[in-house]
Structures are given as structure tokens and as C-alpha cells.
Amino acid sequence: MDTTVINKNTTTMKTISLKSWLTDIIVMAKRELLKVKHSPEKLFDVTVMPIIMVIVFSQLFGGAIMGNVKAYLPLVVPGILIQTLVMASGAAGTQLREDLDKGATDRFNSLPISRIAPLAGTLISDIIRYIIAAVFALGTGAALGWRASAGFGWLLVAIGRLAIVTTWALSWLFALVGVLAKGAATVTTISSFLTMFLAFLSNAYIPVTSLPKWLKVIAENNPVSHLITAFKEVAYNGNFGHEAWLVLLISLLIVLILAPVTVLTYSKKN
Amino acid sequence: MKKEIIMALAISTTNLVKNFDGKNAVNGISLDVHQGEIFGILGPNGAGKTTFLRMLATLTKVTSGSASIFGNDLTKDGAKVRNFIGLTGQYASVDEELTGMENMIIFGQLNGLSKKEAKKRGLELLKQFSLTEAKDKSISAFSGGMRRRLDLAVSLITKPPLIFLDEPTTGLDPRTRGEMWKTIRELVKGGSTIVLTTQYLDEADQLADRIAIIDHGSVIAQGTPSELKNILGETTFELSLIKSSQIKQAKEMIEQKFNIEVIVLPEFATLSIKVTDTKIMTQILLLLETEHIAINEFETRKPTLDEVFLELTGK
């Protein structure tokens, strides 16, 4: 009966289905990628940064920490990869906050789309950023002589099934920060602090055995350390062992807890 | 019969309330918006205009009361309601990094159009809004006025029958503002219903068929611009005489005969009379004629919407 009225105006009534739900998420992800296309500098943190980090860290500290650069590479290359990924995962929060502040989120919420689509779109487009980060960090490492001794297949497993999955799970944490924080600048500050803390108080750059005891306890229990250890185990020894499963389990828990909380906060925000 | 009346309404709200932290930002608004009209919501900053609009656009939950959009319950059928509405917020929310067409395609697809349909409709809209130069260029290269226009164009991608405009011209220069007004008028010709909030009285006066004045979350007056002007109920009738020597005589005569107050503005030999009944004006003119008091010129002046607004909001 409503149609008699609406027909006049030829409204497109969108049918909500699983397909439309997926399309919405893909369109939202595409939006993020188009932004990158127009401002390629947005990829700085996953391209130039890992290149510089791998070169500088290996050349600067290689000799001091392990005696020579070549011996330091197996330790530092996965470390920098994971650090880059963790830092890249922080960007999701900033993006969400900007959309909320600019009124874009309001606009999206007035559309006949599932309310999770803007959030999911951002987080999914991030996966492409993670892949780029992995290529640049490991590519630079390889150019300097780093090798994944278990072979290319295991390396892909380490990246795809471990590093990116874990980072993606972590990005939910930063998405929550983004939804809760007051402004985009605050999100960046909080994310930088968290990622710095997570990356440096770990085994990313140093063997933890060199640390004072209290710091060693922290570094060993840092989830990032677990991830790096697991990554090395898979990439160097071809063993997707209990450390790797533990990391995946933690990631799953993070998503199971944070995803509903973030989505709820995000929609309650109004 | 009753059902038909409800259907003819684009919006109907009953006692709509929005409470934020114990304070009612919207404090029981009941109003009807007819199809095909421009309905203006006028009020000072913080009056609850935007909150009211956000509730109608399903962006914020209704605390109590009810509302229907084209006969669909706002709280129960939010998902359906979103098919009928287009929203343009206070700030341009299109992606500045993206081109005009990319924005069109994204919003078209999110509204359920195929990429091809979205492209076609996007092209039409870019033409209609004179935005063709922004088709393949990032929006950030263009003026604020153009961004606003694109923002509006994007919300029209599915020809929504109901369009919400939240302060559509705030921050625009007078020329761009005029262009925006023109665009809004054209939309209504196409059959859309428009609800716009504004803090500019002249905007409401120029555009709106009907206006609700909102203050402290409540509607304090509602009607057509001329009805609202009639709230003050007075027309000012001003007469200037040729001979300023006769002014005192004229004042006394009119006051006596019609029992109304006459204010003398001596520097122009002018009498200013507030009249509620326009017939009195003719009688005053006749009286002066019979008494041989020559009139230089006269004019009548309706109160401006500004005066009504100030009177009602007590500011």
C-alpha cells in the first residue's frame, strides 16, 4: 500500500540479503582503497617505513647486538615485519574516528546498509595494507641477505595464517580506541603509544635473554613476542607448533571479545 | 479514509522526545509534514533542530513518542525507512580525496544500484548540479560550495522521496547560497519532500512552505511564513503629512475616533499606527480626507520573520 505513494518518486527499494550485505562491505573497502589510490602517501607507513627500518636497524645494531649484520637479520627482519604490521593496524582507528567526526558515518548510517559495513570495510581494506607491508619488509630483508630457511611455502603460511590474521585481530582493538576517543589526533597518540610499547618491549630487536629479569618477564609475555617467536618457528623451521596455535587462539579471543564490543559501541555512539 | 490521510503525510510525529543524560534535547515534538512541501525547522543554535532531524533519519534512537515516515513506523521499520530518505548533514561528508564520480558510484551501490546504474544516475546528477568538472577530479580541489552541492547530489542518487537537509547553507557565501536555494526549489518540483533546518530566518522565509519554530526542544510556533508573521498580529501603517503643523491634530483625531495609539515621528511629519484590522486604514484615510489633512505618502509594513522570531524566543 505504501508503494502507491512511493511509486511516484521511483524509489529504489533495496532488498537486504547476504549478497547485498557482502556488496556493502566490499564497496566500503573499495572506498578506502580509492582513497589510497588518490593519496599514495597513505601507504608510507607500509612501504618506505619498513624499508628504512630494516636497513637502518640491521646496519646500525647488527654489529653491536649480534657481532655482524648477517647474523642479526634472522632476528630483526621478522621483528620489523611484525612491528610494521602492528603499527599499520593502528591506522584503522584513526580512519574510523575521522569518518565519525566528518559526518560520513552519519551519512552511512542513514543508508539502507548493514551498520557493520563501514567498520568491516575499513578493517578488510587494511588487510591489503598488511600484505604490502609484508612484501616491503621481507623484500628489503631478502635484498640484504635474509632467508626464510623453511622455504617459500612456509613463509606464506607464516605471513598469511599467522602474522596478518593476528594483526587483523589487533586492529579491532584500535578500532575500539577510534570509536571511543575524542578526536583523530588522540587516536594516533594512543595507538602510537600502544604500538611502541608492544613492539619495543618484545623480542623484535633484541634477544630477551639480554634483559634485566623484570623486563624479561614483561617482554616474554608480550603477545607480540609470542607472535614473533611463532613466526620464526614457522618460517625458519617449517613448524606450525603450539606457539603458533597459541597466538591464533589469542587472536580469536581478541576478535570474539572486541568485535562485538566495538560494533556495539560504534552503533550505541548515537 | 483515515489511512489515506496518513499516507499523504511524509512525516508524522507524536510527542517525540530525545533525552541526553537526563536532559531533553527534543521535548515532545508533534508535527506533520505533507508530501511535496518544503518544511523548515527554524531555531537558534542548540534548540534541538539537528537532534530532531537525526531521529527522523534513524541516526539516533527515539527516547519516547512515535513517528512515521510515509506510514512506516520509525522505530520498528528503521531499515525500510532508510530507503526513502536522503540526508545531507551540516558538514560536507563526501570523501574529498575521491572524485565526484567515485563518490556517486559508492553511494549508488550502497543504496542498492548496480555500478552501471549508479554511473548513469551519477552522470545525470553531476550535470544537473553543474558539477561535471568534478567528475574525474578529487573534490578537495574544489570550493566549499561545490562540495556541498556534491554532498546534496550524492544524497539524491536514488531519488529519495524525502530529503533531510541539516543547515544546508551554513557557512556558504551569498552567491553559493542563492544557488543552493535554487537547487532546493527544483528538487521539490520533481516531487520530493524536503525538511530543512536553518538558523537563517530569510532562508526559511524564502524556501519553506511551512515553518516550525523550535526553541528548547519544543515547537513554539508553526505555520506558513505569513501565518507566523500574523502571530504578532499587527501591520504597521505609516502616514506622512504634507504640513507638519497638522500632525498633532491628526494624531488626536485618529486616537479619539478609533481608540488606538498613534506614535508621532516628528522629524518626518509621520504618524505610525499599529493596526490589527486592515479596514481601519481606509477609514483613517477617509477621516483625514474629510478634515482636509493632506497626505504626502503612506505605507504598510508587515512584521518581518525576525521580529516574530525575537518575540517568540524572547531574545
Task: Locate predicted features.
Chain B
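ABC transporter nucleotide-binding domains
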Residues: 10-13, 18-215, 219-221
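Short, surface-exposed acidic/glycine-rich loop or hinge patches that mediate macromolecular interfaces
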Residues: 72-75, 219, 244, 275-278, ...
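Active-site-adjacent beta-strand anchor residues
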Residues: 97, 240, 274, 298-299
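A short linear hydrophobic-aromatic micro-motif
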Residues: 130-131, 259-263, 294-299
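ABC transporter nucleotide-binding domain
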Residues: 182-275
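C-terminal coupling/interaction segments
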Residues: 276-315
